[in-house]
């Protein structure tokens, strides 16, 4: 049975697209046939993060409007066998996505994929609403910062009331918290909300903590999902999160301050 | 830094704990509003209009609160009448 997973946050710039690319790639790495769908109509960016921007011919809106088939619009990842991308349209037409059209595409994707990752746009407008409407599970991406936590709580309210599952009285969307851009050092100094603080306020299951890391920018510069950088702390933290998503219990890492060794301190090692 | 400053410094709340406190308050407040039905603001507006037909009151002299008590909800209407 295919699973639809929305990556959402309310607030912009917290790491939704980075997370969608990482989780999609992580699931495909583990043998699950996965598609990542960009819902940010007008501001397409998933293709850049996934490194397939030059291979976009048809997009999500073309499929909805019948100008292309799903087979034509799906972009196969060059690195992984099981991974596909459906790009967002660059149209400025705000009504390009319709609930009926998105539903039709989701049903068709369900037939051939195990996981459908919906990369939500920021905000609570139509694109964000439709990205979460058909979801079975939600990853709420949050930064340890007041406006992001507040917006995440608002999204949790919408997930619980404005989704198809809520409207049909079905089992509610399973919610996961993903804390990104986490700096254990600043938490220790009392300058940043800690994992426990955010968990206490939002009261949902913690999927993972992604440390603030230079590897994230390096990965997006190159169009390689950061999860493929196995040396990096962020890549490893995303791998752990994917394992947990698949039901495995693994301890949370990168929550403590990384202590530099004597030589590293002397020569100033880079992460 | 003298000794007095040292103790005062330790008492000062960290910015993270201020953030947590502020969030807990605003989130609790917004969750309360979220569970309220959509018609509540309209209901309040119309109630004020009806009362105004008879008594001269300001908007903030009428409070409409919906309280959830397990399997039933109580709509509480509180009108402060002006001095006669």
Curated annotation (Swiss-Prot), chain B:
Gene3D superfamilies this protein is in? Cell division topological specificity factor MinE
Respond yes or no to whether keyword Cell division is given for this record: yes
Q: Which UniProt keyword terms apply here?
A: Cell cycle, Cell division
Q: Which family does this protein fall into?
A: Belongs to the MinE family.
Q: What does this protein do?
A: Prevents the cell division inhibition by proteins MinC and MinD at internal division sites while permitting inhibition at polar sites. This ensures cell division at the proper site by restricting the formation of a division septum at the midpoint of the long axis of the cell.
Q: What GO terms in the biological process aspect are recorded for it?
A: cell division; regulation of division septum assembly
In terms of superkingdom, the source organism counts as Bacteria
Encoded by which gene? minE
* InterPro entries with a match to the protein in the record: MinE, MinE_sf
Xref: SUPFAM superfamilies: Cell division protein MinE topological specificity domain
Statement: the UniProt record of this protein carries the keyword rRNA processing: no
State what protein this is by name. Cell division topological specificity factor
């Amino acid at each position: 049975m295919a699973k639809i997973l929305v990556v959402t946050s309310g607030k912009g710039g917290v790491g939704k697209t980075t997370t969608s690319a990482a989780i999609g790639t992580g699931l495909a790495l583990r043998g699950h046939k996965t598609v990542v769908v960009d819902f940010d109509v007008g501001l397409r960016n998933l293709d850049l993060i996934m490194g397939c921007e030059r291979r976009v011919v048809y997009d999500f809106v073309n499929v909805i409007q019948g100008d292309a088939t799903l087979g034509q619009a799906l972009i196969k990842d060059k690195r992984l066998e099981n991974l596909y991308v459906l790009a967002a349209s660059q149209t400025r037409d705000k009504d390009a996505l319709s609930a009926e059209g998105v539903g039709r595409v989701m049903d068709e994707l369900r037939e051939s994929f195990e996981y459908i990752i919906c990369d939500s746009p920021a905000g609570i407008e139509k694109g964000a609403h439709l990205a979460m409407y058909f979801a079975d599970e939600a990853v709420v991406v949050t930064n340890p910062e007041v406006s992001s936590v507040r917006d995440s709580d608002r999204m949790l309210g919408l997930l619980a009331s404005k989704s198809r599952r809520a409207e049909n009285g079905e089992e509610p969307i399973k919610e996961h918290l993903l804390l990104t851009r986490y700096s254990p050092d600043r938490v220790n100094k009392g300058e940043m909300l800690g994992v426990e603080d955010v968990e206490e306020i939002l009261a949902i299951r913690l999927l993972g903590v992604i440390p603030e890391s230079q590897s994230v920018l390096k990965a997006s510069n190159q169009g390689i999902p950061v999860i493929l950088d196995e040396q990096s702390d962020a890549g490893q933290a995303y791998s752990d999160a994917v394992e947990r998503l698949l039901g495995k219990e693994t301890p949370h890492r990168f929550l403590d301050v990384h202590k530099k060794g004597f030589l590293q301190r002397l020569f100033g090692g880079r992460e | 830094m003298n000794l007095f400053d040292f103790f005062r410094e330790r008492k000062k709340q960290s910015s993270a704990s201020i953030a947590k406190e502020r969030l807990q308050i605003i989130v609790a407040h917004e969750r309360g509003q979220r569970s309220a039905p959509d018609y509540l603001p309209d209901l309040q507006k119309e109630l004020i209009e009806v009362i105004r037909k008879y008594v001269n009151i300001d908007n903030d002299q009428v409070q409409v609160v919906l309280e959830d008590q397990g399997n039933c909800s109580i709509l509480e209407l509180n009108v402060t009448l002006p001095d006669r």
